[in-house]
């Protein structure tokens, strides 16, 4: 049988979650009769329906987040396998820059290292 520490940390955790779950039924000031000094502060600019993600509106504003939307496949592409590019990644280099850079394979020496 596991020993429960008598330091009070388990009681403090229980009280925290009990206050957190009971905060929806507290008075308009944010406090409660059971815990008069514990007021849950609510910013006037934040929606009350989603208090757990206040940081999303802080960083991203009120716009919708396109990267969090559901991605749907089109019917004509659902039967195909995903397309994989066989070309090397250029990392934003222009074709002119790619022509100037020599391709060095393993086992070859770099002409720039010789000078």
UniProtKB/Swiss-Prot annotation:
Region listing for Disordered, in residue ranges: 21-46, 73-115
Presence of the UniProt keyword Cell cycle in the record: no
Disulphide connectivity of cysteines: none
BP terms from Gene Ontology: cell differentiation; liver development; TOR signaling; TORC1 signaling
Keywords tagged on the record: Developmental protein, Differentiation, Phosphoprotein
Residues the record lists as Phosphoserine modifications: 9
Compositional bias (Low complexity): 22-32
Entry superkingdom: Eukaryota
Compositional bias per record (Polar residues), positions renumbered to this chain: 106-115
Function: Probable regulator of exocrine pancreas development.
Sequence similarity: Belongs to the PPDPF family.
Name the UniProt record assigns to this protein: Pancreatic progenitor cell differentiation and proliferation factor
Taxonomy of the source species: Eukaryota, Metazoa, Chordata, Craniata, Vertebrata
